[in-house]
Design a protein with these regions (language model features):
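N-terminal active-site segment of His-dependent metallophosphoesterases
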Residues: 1-29
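Short, hydrophobic beta-strand segments that form beta-sheet elements in well-ordered domains
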Residues: 14, 21, 43, 184-190, ...
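Extended active-site neighborhood of metal-dependent phosphoesterases/phosphodiesterases
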Residues: 26-119, 142-146, 180, 197-218
Length: 220
């Protein structure tokens, strides 16, 4: 009710960066569908939308087990979608498992060709030094839980986390493209359960929103 009230008051849509549920269940999916259908909400999928329980291998095969239910949450592609709001192209890309797929970079390039400023909506924040340092301190395993972490760090992770969060070629390609594309003006992300703002590539603000925070962000 509070979120809906803010949306009515401001006239702005809600940008949700994932984990709208904690685990997959019939009841949780029903609640999420009602919320999204009743709210002006643009949604980037998170890892918990696919989570049947903790500790399982996270890959496209695992996603596929619950993807049919996740796809019912929104009337667009959960892997990649865009929406123009106030002259800004908001692009939601699924990186819920710490990687990007090859076609997502190609699709982002086509969005950029529209010529509008782009704000990326991701679940997992992109690697940035200060955020990585904070995450390493908070993690009992000294793990970043970020997308695009250099191999110099992930190679020292416990084996399960290294395989989970290693930066593959497709992910490196996407991040290289984001770093060099000046029409990409900001990144909105979630996943970490706390608020954090930093700068990527010396020019792109990355705004991480925690699990209990509702922000109003002004883009100029």
């Amino acid at each position: 009710d509070y979120v809906r009230g803010v949306i009515r008051k401001t006239g702005l849509p809600l940008i949700h960066t994932g984990d709208i549920i904690d685990f997959t269940s019939r009841e949780n999916f029903a609640i999420a569908r009602r919320f999204i259908s009743d709210t002006d909400c643009f949604f980037a999928v998170g890892n918990h939308e696919f989570a049947q329980k903790l500790g399982e291998k996270e890959d496209e095969d695992y996603k596929a087990q619950t993807a049919p239910e996740v796809k019912k949450l929104v009337p667009y592609d959960i892997r990649f979608a865009s929406r123009i709001i106030g002259g800004i192209n908001f692009v939601a890309i699924d990186n819920a498992y710490y990687y990007f797929l090859p076609d997502q970079t190609d699709r982002l390039k086509r969005e950029v060709q529209k010529g509008l400023p782009v704000v990326l909506c991701l679940h997992v924040p992109l690697y940035e030094k200060s955020l990585y340092a904070k995450q390493s301190e908070l993690s009992a395993e000294s793990v970043g839980f970020l997308c695009g972490v250099p191999d110099a760090y992930t190679n020292a992770y416990p084996e399960f986390r290294r395989l989970q969060q290693h930066t593959d070629a497709a992910t490196a390609r996407m991040i290289e493209y984001i770093a060099g594309e000046t029409l990409i003006r900001a990144v909105l992300a979630g996943h970490l359960h706390y608020d954090y703002t930093s700068t990527l590539f010396d020019r792109v603000p990355q705004i991480v929103t925690g699990k209990s925070t509702l922000r109003t962000v002004e883009f100029r």
